[in-house]
Amino acid sequence: MPSQNAVFSQEGNMEEEEMNDGSQMVRSQESLTFQDVAVDFTREEWDQLYPAQKNLYRDVMLENYRNLVALGYQLCKPEVIAQLELEEEWVIERDSLLDTHPDGENRPEIKKSTTSQNISDENQTHEMIMERLAGDSFWYSILGGLWDFDYHPEFNQENHKRYLGQVTLTHKKITQERSLECNKFAENCNLNSNLMQQRIPSIKIPLNSDTQGNSIKHNSDLIYYQGNYVRETPYEYSECGKIFNQHILLTDHIHTAEKPSECGKAFSHTSSLSQPQMLLTGEKPYKCDECGKRFSQRIHLIQHQRIHTGEKPFICNGCGKAFRQHSSFTQHLRIHTGEKPYKCNQCGKAFSRITSLTEHHRLHTGEKPYECGFCGKAFSQRTHLNQHERTHTGEKPYKCNECGKAFSQSAHLNQHRKIHTREKLCEYKCEQTVRHSPSFSST
């Protein structure tokens, strides 16, 4: 009899198979049926399942059906889906079996009814779609009523139809707590409170279809960003930066971590509820096992660990350049688009990076918030403080690959590298001169 873990593994394999099948679905929407993504059990197989495994089957079947509906397929609701939505135990009756298969086993029939649902109906208002998401969403049933849903519609220019581009989930109580903290932190640090709200944990679930109409991929294994399809990373949890290619892995990640008493929902660390305070106090509870460096936020530790592993999960679809951090990837995309969303309220100058805007503000205010712990000298930029502190510590983290010489600043290393470049250029010119000299030719 299969174990519960085996069924979880089977679900992951099933999702991978469905995503692979998506590239072959070049048929018209009218020819796609629910049976194409349904999973069948024989009577004997069904009797061997535990109740928890049957519940898992129910969740997967409902999710498959609702994904097709969300993508705009006009489907007649199968009888099995109607039963599963009522949370009735699916009992295989004699009169609900298909004809005997060639292998001699009977499989349950998926009957059609006259009921049809279409979540992307143009006549539906934002409130109606949100109500449908809250009432029917697989994620809502998994994560519970403490999550707020928001959707981001995409518009297909070819068929002039709207579809759900992405669903964002934010935790209600965490959002309220974090909003208060962000506002206080922004007030103390003279920052825009709207920018600080980006620290609120959220889950983004893309639900995109191929805009060329060539294929529909299960649950969308592509993220659509500013006209580019980028890397197969369906689910990213903003609180810790981890990426998951299966919803069940993300769910496990959220629910197996430590649970704050305030709301009962799980996050990667209890101190994630007070990260703004940690920034003020200087607390750094997250330590890298490789080099011992410490960080105040878990996402910064994860980003740092990619330096050791060499992982660069964010790939630009325009030029192929890869990045360790999503923020760097977003900033890079603005090179292609020319977007400068951060504008100075005093002089009107615009910037593509928020850090550039923050540093620019200090030209107007004269603020120097970064103070050296050794001598008390203050700086307007953290990078300048880091460079200055190395004069006290003697640290030289930038090393030349050619000769091994180390430097305290990257600018000094770049200047040093030009020496090797000039040396190589001189060697090349000398070699060419010797090659073309008469004495060399005569030999």
UniProtKB/Swiss-Prot annotation:
Alphabetized SUPFAM superfamilies for the sequence: beta-beta-alpha zinc fingers, KRAB domain (Kruppel-associated box)
Annotated region Disordered: the residues are: 1-23, 99-118
The terms describing its cellular component in GO are:
nucleus
A single BP term in Gene Ontology: regulation of DNA-templated transcription
Q: Which disease is it linked to?
A: A 7p11.2 folate-sensitive fragile site, FRA7A, has been identified in 2 unrelated families diagnosed with an autistic disorder. FRA7A is associated with a CGG-repeat expansion in a ZNF713 5'-intron. In the first family, the expanded allele contained about 450 CGG-repeats. It showed hypermethylation and reduced ZNF713 expression. In the second family, 3 autistic siblings exhibited a heterozygous expansion of about 70 repeats, corresponding to premutations, which were partially or mosaically methylated. Mitotic instability of the premutation was observed in one affected sibling.
The UniProt entry's sequence similarity note says: Belongs to the krueppel C2H2-type zinc-finger protein family.
This chain's protein is named Zinc finger protein 713
Q: Which gene encodes it?
A: ZNF713
